[in-house]
Design a protein with these regions (language model features):
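Conserved helicase motor
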Residues: 125, 146-154, 170-175, 196-202, ...
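SF2 helicase motor core recognition
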Residues: 174-179, 228-230, 389-393, 415-419, ...
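Conserved P-loop NTPase motor "coupling/switch" region that bridges the ATPase
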Residues: 115-117, 132, 161-162, 188, ...
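Conserved Helicase C-terminal RecA-like lobe
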Residues: 93-96, 101-122, 293-317, 321-431, ...
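A conserved SF2-helicase RecA2
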Residues: 457-466, 470-517
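Conserved helix-turn-beta segment of the N-terminal RecA-like "Helicase ATP-binding" lobe
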Residues: 127-150, 240-243
Length: 517
């Protein structure tokens, strides 16, 4: 029971064990006792450690939850859980608002003086769109910087400045680990998409482990813990709950896996329970459990163009600027020109003779793989161009991710077979589709994630594509839509699609803006 938002009151038969808490009072009530304890974060943690169940964090009543958005109940519960655990996991599904929960919890600890600086480790693709975006929408009063630069010296300078929140990518930590340790004020490390640290022999794992002290807060977040193999839990547990796993990886492997042949291992019957015990303390919300989430949650992944893409993109943009000088650009001309820019952005462009020119687009494909790793369910990937569909499919096949293609060259009977397998069988896991082939009425509810590997040129088509998964028969209740973008033209088009702006005059206006950027 919470009394006046100041004290916790509960019954006990053994009041003596609470004597270690300075701010407490024991009262005899009948044959038993009631204990009143000051409701502070430290006191709440001690009560939890003493075995008192369901001790609430003071953040639930003593925090103003700053920012544009009112927190949803599952976000409050997640933030409260984080404040009560120095090291913990958040395994909630993608699109449930883990980022905001972690930022609010961090801000609360900073207000209490328990955390001075925060280091956030995440993929490049979500440093700006997810983390910096949510900082601006919530804890805007905190100073923040993205410590990402081609030169290590510049990254080090960013660390040495007094920004309260520093965001960097996994590999970037290796360049600044010494400075982070020397600073001594990074009391909290937040790791997003934590599966990147599943292997404890990698450089990135060792870099992270090197900056942690027994007093460091560490919150690791992923929607799919140990999704590929029970052995994947080892690296994560060694960071958060080292007592929960053996000292050496081979002992963990022998505990959770059976050796079938010289090179083949299979999970033991008890592996799931062992992984669950190792990956604690943890909190998880599925999208279906988050009743206050909208039915469709949209997320953005940003990826830099490769030098090759940037070179040809800028060259083509310059040519367009010359061609447009003094001429009236029609919507048809604008659409054709922007199509070329979109093709380069996605990694495969057509020449005037319909020959395909492939560009280095490895970072974009890696971002797609990140998205797939963050959900355990099936995924639909939409790409405008056949050349890009081929590139995606080839990449997924090399990564041993079962996939099928649907586009204009696939017959109606074969499409029906592919859709039936996608809906009713374990494989394919990914369907790579051309939007034009996504006819009205097609149901693809086996997927709960829709990825746009670049923007479309029509709001109607975009809405139809989202509706393939967001329709009757969807068991997830919530669908996640992911935009992958890199170039200015993509960002402008995705913004127009999100705002449902579908006007031919927009194309000419956007064309003029793009070529003049």
């Amino acid at each position: 029971q919470i009394v006046d938002n100041k004290a916790l009151l509960f019954k006990t038969r053994n009041p003596a064990k609470y004597s270690i808490i300075p701010k407490h009072k024991v009262m005899q009530v009948g044959d038993g006792y009631e204990v009143a304890v000051y409701w502070g974060l430290d006191e709440a943690r001690v009560l939890r450690n003493l075995g008192v169940k369901d001790v609430p964090s003071p953040i639930t009543k003593r925090y103003d939850w700053p920012g544009r958005y009112k927190p949803m109940q599952h976000q409050i519960d997640t933030a409260a859980f984080l404040t009560m655990h120095r090291r913990s996991f958040v395994f909630s599904e993608p699109g449930t608002g883990k980022t905001l929960s972690a930022l609010w919890a961090a801000d609360y600890l900073m207000k209490l003086g328990k955390v001075r600086r925060v280091l956030i480790l995440c993929p490049l693709s979500i440093m700006h769109s997810a983390w910096m975006g949510d900082i601006n929408n919530s804890v805007l009063h905190r100073s923040a910087i993205i410590a990402h630069h081609p030169k290590a010296a510049r990254r080090i300078e960013m660390i040495q400045q007094d920004y309260e929140i520093v965001i960097t990518n996994y590999e970037g930590l290796g360049l600044i680990a010494d400075e982070v340790k020397a600073d001594g004020r990074f009391d909290l490390v937040i790791v997003d998409e934590a599966n990147a640290y599943k292997t404890n022999t990698t450089r990135r794992w060792k870099a992270l482990n090197s900056i942690l002290t027994p007093q460091t807060y560490l919150w690791m977040m992923t929607g799919t813990p140990a999704s590929q193999s029970p052995t994947d839990a080892y690296g994560l547990a060694k960071l958060v709950n080292p007592e929960g796993v053996p000292k050496f990886f081979t002992a963990w492997r022998d505990k959770v896996m059976n050796k079938i042949t010289m090179y083949k291992w299979a999970p033991k019957v008890t592996a799931k329970d062992d992984v669950f015990s190792a990956l604690q303390p943890a909190i998880r919300f599925t999208k279906a459990e988050c009743l206050d989430l909208p039915p469709v949650v949209t997320m953005t992944r940003e990826v830099e163009m490769t030098p090759q893409q940037a070179k040809y993109y800028n060259t083509l943009k310059t040519q367009m600027l010359v061609q447009a000088a003094g001429e009236t650009i029609t919507a048809v001309n604008a659409a054709a020109a922007m199509n070329k820019l979109l093709q380069i952005s996605c990694g495969a462009a057509y020449t005037d003779d319909r020959e395909v020119v492939e560009f280095d687009s490895a970072p974009r494909l890696s971002v797609l793989e990140e998205v797939l790793e963050e959900t355990s369910r099936k995924v639909i990937v939409f790409a405008l161009y056949l050349s890009v569909i081929e590139t995606i499919s080839t990449y997924l096949t090399k990564k041993r991710i079962a996939n099928e293609q649907i586009h204009g060259g696939v017959t109606a009977s074969k499409r029906a077979q592919i859709i039936h397998r996608f809906q009713n069988e374990p494989e394919p896991r990914v369907l790579v589709m051309q939007p034009q082939a996504s006819a009205h009425g097609i149901t693809l509810t086996a997927a709960d994630t829709v990825v746009f590997y670049g923007p479309l040129m029509s709001v109607e088509q975009y809405t139809q594509c989202c509706a393939r998964a967001d329709r009757k028969g969807q068991t997830s209740d919530k669908v996640t839509v992911v935009h992958i973008q890199s170039s200015p033209v993509e960002k402008r088009l995705f913004k127009a699609l999100s705002q449902k702006v579908d006007d031919h005059s927009l194309l000419t206006e956007m064309f003029n803006n793009v070529i003049s950027e």
